[in-house]
């Protein structure tokens, strides 16, 4: 195994009083909460792209990070070195899963033939590394947005040859995900949107992406992939407007093309921020629509209008997120993938550990606080009482379709209905939640 991170043996749980920066203060993977271990609840994953592929570049500057595997003249050899170091990191951090795009793990090459050769070579290596370490693949995906061929979209591109290239990448990436035991396959339409309506046929592009997703579902069943298909919503960036704007928009799209039973959502915190929603809102919406699948854990900056992909650090925010997840029954095939990157000035390789350790502890503490909310049932009891009238005769008749507008007008008149406003108790409920978080 690689020894790139030679200062660390393995990150372990030492408890809240520990001052060791390379120890977990709250994440005890074997601690049982609501009948499952923390590890089973959280299903943590490290992302390949931000962690091992990013150079530290931004819109105004070149890469600032010193990564040995990015300096090799032979790109495939660099990819092999990167895989060794990645699995060293996974093992020493002690997380069970990782995630990747196809071109994260292998150089794209200059032709389709080179792409396939490089990708298959690296899949062979990842398969061996998984067997050696026990680390598993949470999900795989294809990068159909970085190459200039995708500047006008992938499945929504005006050129069917570009559509075909995207299909070829998804074909290879899904096959690899199945081979590696991946539990999900993600589709993020990085450039599935538009810059201007002046050169865009919205109806045609919607039909194209709808057919593409149908083809993805068809291939899943053809190869016997038993994992979950996931779409990741995002409102904009890099395009001005993306078609998978938010969870509700994705659900409408799935319904239009008959895919609502086939595809769920992978929700990213920062994407919720960009869409003008809270992270909690997006998860609650997905659960209500029965399309909740997985999470990309990170945070955005409300003062900035772009995807900052910072590590989550708010127990207040994530307690409510965990509460929604627990109410929905928890993850099945999904989990918490850290789609987060260290800052451009964080040039020490061990900053990767600090970012992940802190984020994992935030999720662990949030899980414990949310579990208390579930166990006590106080909050849910207040919500149940608020809607109790719908369990009575009138409410049930309305929901069962046994009352028309005319029927209800007659009831209001005959019974002289005069309902009085009832307090929503928002301030009390906010105090109640804070009591769980801070006690």
Curated annotation (Swiss-Prot):
The keyword DNA damage does not apply. This is Xylose isomerase. It comes from Actinobacillus pleuropneumoniae serotype 5b (strain L20). The gene is xylA. One of its GO terms (biological process) is D-xylose metabolic process. The lineage of its organism: Bacteria, Pseudomonadati, Pseudomonadota, Gammaproteobacteria, Pasteurellales. Its cofactor is Mg(2+). Belongs to the xylose isomerase family. It catalyses: alpha-D-xylose = alpha-D-xylulofuranose. Mg(2+) 1 binds at residues 232, 268, 296, 339. Binds 2 magnesium ions per subunit. The active site is at residues 101, 104.
């Amino acid at each position: 195994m690689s020894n790139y991170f030679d200062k660390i043996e393995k990150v372990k749980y030492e408890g809240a009083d520990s001052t060791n920066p390379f120890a977990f203060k709250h994440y005890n993977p074997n601690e049982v909460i609501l009948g499952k271990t923390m590890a089973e609840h959280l299903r943590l994953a490290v992302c390949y792209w931000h962690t091992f592929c990013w150079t530290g570049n931004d819109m105004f500057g070149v890469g600032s990070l010193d990564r040995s595997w990015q300096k090799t003249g032979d790109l495939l050899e660099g990819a092999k070195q990167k895989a060794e170091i990645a699995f060293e990191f996974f093992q020493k951090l002690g997380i069970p899963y990782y995630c990747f795009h196809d071109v994260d793990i292998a150089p794209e090459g200059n032709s389709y033939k080179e792409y396939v050769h490089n990708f298959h070579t690296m899949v062979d290596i990842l398969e061996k590394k998984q067997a050696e370490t026990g680390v598993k693949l949470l999900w795989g995906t294809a990068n159909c947005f970085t190459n200039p061929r995708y500047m006008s979209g992938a499945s929504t591109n005006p050129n069917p040859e570009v559509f075909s290239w995207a299909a070829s990448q998804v074909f290879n990436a899904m096959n690899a995900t199945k081979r590696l035991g991946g539990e999900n396959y993600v589709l993020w339409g990085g450039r599935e949107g538009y810059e201007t309506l002046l050169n865009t046929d919205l109806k045609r592009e919607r039909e194209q992406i709808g057919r593409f997703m149908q083809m993805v579902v068809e291939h899943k069943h053809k190869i016997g992939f038993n994992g979950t298909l996931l779409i990741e919503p995002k409102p904009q960036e890099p395009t001005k407007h993306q078609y998978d704007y938010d969870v509700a928009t994705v659900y409408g799209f799935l319904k239009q093309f008959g895919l609502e039973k086939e595809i769920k959502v992978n929700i990213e915190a920062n994407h919720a921020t960009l869409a003008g929603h809270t992270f909690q809102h997006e998860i609650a919406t997905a659960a209500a629509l029965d399309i909740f699948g997985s999470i990309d854990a990170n945070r955005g900056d409300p003062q900035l209008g772009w995807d900052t992909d910072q590590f989550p650090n708010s127990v207040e925010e994530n307690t409510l997120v965990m509460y929604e997840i627990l109410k929905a029954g928890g993850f099945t095939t999904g989990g918490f993938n850290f789609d987060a990157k260290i800052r451009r000035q964080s040039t020490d390789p061990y900053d990767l550990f600090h970012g992940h350790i802190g984020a994992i502890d935030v999720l662990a503490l949030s899980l414990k606080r949310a579990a208390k909310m579930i166990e006590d049932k106080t909050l849910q009891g207040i919500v149940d009482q608020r809607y109790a009238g719908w369990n009575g005769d009138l409410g049930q008749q309305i929901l069962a379709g046994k009352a028309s507008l005319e029927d209800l007008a007659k009831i209001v008149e005959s019974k002289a209905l005069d309902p009085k406003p009832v307090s929503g108790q928002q301030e009390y409920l906010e105090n109640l939640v804070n009591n769980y978080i801070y006690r």
